[in-house]
Design a protein with these regions (language model features):
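Histidine-anchored nucleotide/phosphate-binding helix
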Residues: 31-45, 329-334
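Short loop->beta transition adjacent to catalytic acidic/histidine clusters or analogous donor-positioning motifs
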Residues: 44-53, 78
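Short internal beta-strands
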Residues: 50-57, 151-152, 341-347
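Active-site-proximal specificity loops/subdomain of glycosyltransferases
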Residues: 71-114
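Short aromatic/hydrophobic "clamp" motif used to bind/position activated sugar donors
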Residues: 123
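Conserved donor-nucleotide/metal-binding helix-loop-beta segment in metal-dependent transferases, i.e.
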Residues: 130-163
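Hydrophobic, well-ordered beta-alpha structural blocks that scaffold small-molecule cofactor pockets
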Residues: 294-419
Length: 419
């Protein structure tokens, strides 16, 4: 107890750090992912933190109570804002927009100025699928831009493996300035000058249906010119770090962003999965017995999925795509029967993907019914192919499901734990 008192005194001697998360939890399982992020935030700072949770009616009272318990155990503050109750008309319009790629919570960060207390002058926004492997006060002490915003450029966050964005292709935003909206810092007095950014931004999306990252494209439309470019350590994409040419052997002091379902908890050798799970087990959501049962269920699901994949591959012309220098070696070292398969090199160099090679191959070989097995940068290629109308599971698959037989989506596993 004495140690906890000393820790509390130390916290009270520092400035308050304000951090915000947005949660839409229709299934009841997403709260668990945010809990791991919060645990990493608490564990890695001695600062006094107030967490502001923007949520709606999908956040259950049980999960809210667990968040409160988690914060109190760390001597921190947590405040909840029910957006359905505070801004019912705006939230109704967001939920009626029928964008199934992103949850309504993605837009809640555009409404901060309407719900935060006036004494909050600066705030960090964090996506729920992040692990804070540094002291959050370091980010809080960074400057913001002339327009009151600080963020990491997407090209840097993805180590130059980002998918093209239409808002950049049409010249509205310079590609090198386009930033990620998953980790942001706002000077709230300046951000408050844009009270209608959410609804006005939704009108922009209506005029440009090709803009497929709603909140991110809106924020870039308004702020890409004069925001402060944060160092990449404040928004580092885990999927990019797993690429053979970028892979790091040790964890760094940074904020890891598990965007694109990058959590694969049953791949135990992966340092980023280990990092996430090390924090998750400390949360009030973790139950060891339930977890072990879920892993067993997950393994059976993986086995069943392999059978489905093999049926999809039957009587198809198989095309592996990836980096000739690294992925081809992985393929040759695997036990997969590659007889008759084509390998499509889609890398100009170790950091540059030529997405057009995938698209051109499909167009030129339609009659041969090709099945593309993507060996690296799958989230990026998946997004690009889906935008062109190709179907995951029919036209292309993630080859890692064949090369590694112990994987299952981390979010799927967490859903199983929630049963």
């Amino acid at each position: 107890m004495g140690e906890n008192i000393l820790k509390e005194i130390k916290k009270c001697s520092t400035n308050m750090v304000h951090v915000c998360y947005a949660i839409y939890d229709k299934t009841g399982s997403f709260s668990r992912i945010a809990a791991a992020s919060l645990q990493s935030l608490y564990d890695n700072t001695d600062a006094w933190v107030t967490v502001h949770i923007l949520h709606d009616n999908t956040l259950s009272e049980e999960n809210k109570e667990k968040y409160i318990y988690q914060a109190r155990m760390q001597g921190q503050n947590i405040v909840f804002y029910n957006m359905d109750e505070l801004l019912p008309d705006v939230i109704a319009k967001i939920k009626a927009s029928d964008n199934d790629r992103f949850s309504p919570a993605a837009m809640y960060r555009l409404l901060l100025m309407h719900v935060l207390p006036k004494n909050v002058k600066k705030i960090i926004y964090l996506d729920c699928d992040t692990i804070i492997n540094l002291d959050i006060e370091k980010l809080y002490n960074e400057p913001v831009g002339e327009n009151g915003v600080a963020a990491v450029a997407e090209l840097e966050a993805t180590f130059y493996h980002a998918v093209e964005k239409e808002i950049c292709n049409n010249g509205t935003v310079k590609r090198e300035n386009y930033f990620c909206s998953g980790i942001l810092m706002f000077d709230t007095e300046k951000y408050n000058n844009y009270p209608d950014i959410c609804l006005d931004g939704m009108e922009i999306l209506k005029k440009h249906p090709e803009y497929d990252c709603p909140d991110q494209d809106i924020l870039n439309y308004y702020f890409a010119d004069k925001y402060y470019h944060l160092p990449v350590k404040y928004d580092t994409f885990v999927d990019a770090l797993r690429l053979p040419e970028i892979k790091q052997d040790e964890l760094q002091e940074c904020i890891y962003h598990y965007a694109g379902n990058a959590m694969e908890l049953t791949k135990s050798e992966d340092i980023y999965n280990q990092l996430f799970f090390n924090y998750y087990v400390k949360t009030p959501w973790f139950d060891g017995n339930v977890f072990l049962k879920a892993v067993s269920v997950a393994m059976k699901a993986r086995h069943d999925a392999d059978k489905v994949i093999m049926n999809i591959m039957k009587d198809r012309n198989i095309v592996f795509c990836g980096n000739k220098e690294t992925d081809l070696q992985r393929l040759q070292a695997s036990k997969i029967n590659c007889n008759g398969a084509v390998f499509l090199n889609i890398y100009a160099d170790k950091n540059t993907i030529i997405m057009e090679k995938c698209l051109d191959y499909f167009e030129q070989n339609k009659k041969d019914r090709p099945l593309l097995l993507v060996m690296s940068a799958y989230p990026l290629i998946n997004q690009a192919l889906a935008q062109k109308g190709y179907k995951e599971g029919t036209d292309y698959l993630d080859a890692s499901t064949l090369l590694i037989h112990d994987g299952i989506s981390g979010r799927d596993l967490l859903k199983m734990i929630n049963l």
